[in-house]
From Swiss-Prot:
GO terms for molecular function: membrane insertase activity. The chain crosses the membrane at residues 6-26, 332-352, 358-378, 428-448, 501-521. It is a multi-pass membrane protein. This is Membrane protein insertase YidC. Belongs to the OXA1/ALB3/YidC family. Type 1 subfamily. One of its GO terms (biological process) is protein transport. PANTHER family: CYTOCHROME C OXIDASE ASSEMBLY PROTEIN COX18, MITOCHONDRIAL, OXA1. It holds the Pfam family 60KD_IMP. It is found in: Cell inner membrane. Coiled coil: none annotated.
């Protein structure tokens, strides 16, 4: 095996990685689910899961129930980083704008809409109380009222509490509170339940994320996709488990969990319900022809007459920032999907972030991290390039052996190994150093792909978004040129077919990287450039040394 084969294998590995991403999205691993059951879709958009009451031997039968429409009476709440709309019908958050994240480089004045309730795209965060009416779950309509239609967190405020007031027909006086905190994407949602009736009230607290037929970001050879779908964490069993939309269509998730969280993911952004760590819930998924839901329903809640009780959960709607997610709930940071080498990716991102705090530019941070990685692997790379230089000096002797023995491959192989032994050259010496570096490359690959910090982050000149492709495709062309220069430094392959394949590689990689994120292409350019300089120096150094003594290799 020589360095050319390693390059070929790396090319195949890159293509395989892209194909694997596409395969995982199209054919994800099966999740722990049960057979698909019935569900109830109320006219206000709530999908209620099947519940088995303690006094029932069979699962309840869910029936469709007509309810009056909400009329879409909304209130607006604005903080320093969030702008949300709350529907007074059930107190659902039906719009969530992220004020610090523009929609695109071209639309800097439009905030990114993570949650929205449009005809073309519905993505909302529901929370409700419901009871069992015989065998049928029935969502309680409180028709909430609010003191104001617009709430805003003032610059001198650290917290804003929005209270909705409502009453139910069965004797509940409910206050639904939303607690917003300055600089935070986490919202506390609490129900303060007062039983003003004369009988015991028994019901359930339900939270869910509902999304209508989202467009999934699928991978291909020429495009790197990112996971779009649901996920959950069940402490002690599943730290982080994806549930794709295709899984939801086939069968319903049904998992008992203590603590944990449920989430809807997409590239760079996340919504998640985080129950109290000591609360017990049933995590479920439901799917209709156009809607996909992941939810959590509590254990039965009882409130005696004239007594009060508070139930609630936390809702996160914002960017996938690992340092923030770590502080909210265990394993929530795993939604920043760094893949199987997440631990190594996390270390590399921490290094990138530390450099960014000094230089103030993510592009230069990528450049400097690449330099540090090359320095860390300098000796290994030097060993590889030294082996290549030695192999280059042996090319005339190897060619002479091929001419001497013609088509006798056995004698050529035997004579070649004897030559390596006499010249003290290890043909595998250039392979191991490169193989050791591959995990680092893969880990950094996922960091550059998944880190929201690179979204719309400028570098220099025309590169104004490291997470998007170079609009003029200059970087992929430069990257292809660096690969071509690297090939010129290597000895020409003796096999004509292999030589043609090697010449085609720069073209192949240029095509592969044509629409890749600029940050990823930048890494490859810097890495290739540093490799060229190191290889040129070492090759020149060993080429200038006194030539090895001529050794006549003979076949035994």
């Amino acid at each position: 095996m020589d360095i050319r084969r390693i390059v070929l294998y790396m090319a195949l590995a890159l293509i395989g990685l892209s194909l694997w991403n596409a395969w995982q999205i199209d054919y994800p691993a099966k999740q722990p689910v049960e057979e698909k059951t019935a569900s109830q879709l109320t006219s206000d958009g709530h999908l209620l899961p099947q519940i088995i009451p303690s006094n029932a031997e069979q699962p309840v039968t869910l029936k469709a129930e007509e309810k009056a429409s909400s009329g879409k009476q909304l209130i607006q709440v604005k903080t320093d980083i969030l702008d949300v709309d709350i529907d007074l019908k059930n107190g659902d958050i039906v719009k969530g704008l992220l004020l610090d994240y523009p929609l695109s480089v071209e639309d800097k004045n439009k905030p990114f809409p993570l949650l929205q309730n449009q005809a073309s795209q519905r993505y909302v965060a529901n929370s409700s109380l419901f009871v069992l009416d015989g065998q049928t779950p029935q969502s309680l309509d409180f028709d909430f009222t609010s003191e104001k239609e617009y709430y805003e967190l003032k610059p001198d405020q650290n917290q804003l509490i929005v209270t909705l007031n409502g009453k139910s027909e069965d004797g509940l006086d409910v206050k639904k509170e939303f607690v917003f905190t300055k600089g935070s994407y986490l919202i506390e949602v609490n129900y303060k339940i007062a039983n003003i009736g004369n009988s015991l009230w028994k019901g359930y607290f339900n939270t869910q994320l509902l999304r209508s037929s989202p467009k999934e970001d699928k991978s291909s050879i020429f495009h790197i996709g990112s996971y779009t779908g649901a996920s959950f964490s069940n402490p002690g069993k599943n730290r982080y488990q994806k549930v794709s939309f295709s899984d939801m269509s086939k069968s319903n998730l049904d998992v008992d969990a203590k603590g944990g969280w449920i989430a809807m993911q997409q590239h760079y952004f996340l919504s998640a319900w985080v129950p109290n760590a000591d609360s017990e819930n049933k995590f479920y998924t439901l799917a209709t022809d156009k809607d996909y839901t992941i939810g959590a329903v509590s254990q039965p809640i009882t409130v005696k007459p004239k007594e009060d009780k508070i139930v609630g959960s936390k809702l996160y709607i914002g960017p996938e920032i690992t340092s923030v997610l770590k502080g909210i709930s265990p394993s929530l940071d795993l939604t920043v999907d760094y893949g199987i080498l997440w631990f190594l990716s996390s270390l590399l991102f921490s290094l990138m972030k530390a450099i960014y705090t000094v230089v103030g530019n993510w592009g230069w941070s990528i450049v400097l991290v690449t330099v540090l990685i090359k320095l860390a692997f300098y000796r290994l790379s030097a060993t590889s390039y030294k082996s290549m230089a030695s192999m280059r000096k042996l090319q005339p002797k190897l060619q002479a052996l091929r001419e001497r023995y013609g088509d006798d491959k056995a004698k050529i192989s035997q004579a070649t190994m004897e030559l390596y032994k006499q010249e003290k050259v290890n043909p595998l010496g250039g392979c191991l150093p490169i193989l050791i570096q591959i995990p680092v490359f893969i880990a950094l690959y996922w960091v550059l792909l998944e880190s929201v910090e690179l979204r719309q982050a400028p570098f220099i000149f025309w590169i104004n978004d490291l997470a998007s492709a170079d609009p003029y495709h200059v970087l992929p062309l430069i990257m292809g040129a660096t690969m071509l220069i690297q090939q010129k430094l290597n000895p020409a392959p003796a096999d004509p077919m292999q030589a043609k394949v090697m010449m085609f590689l720069p073209i192949l990689f240029t095509g592969l990287f044509w629409n890749f994120p600029s940050g990823l292409v930048l890494y490859w350019i810097v890495n290739n450039t540093l490799s060229i300089l190191q290889q040129w120096y070492i090759t020149r150094k060993y080429s200038d040394e006194k030539p090895a003594k001529k050794v006549v290799a003979t076949a035994k």
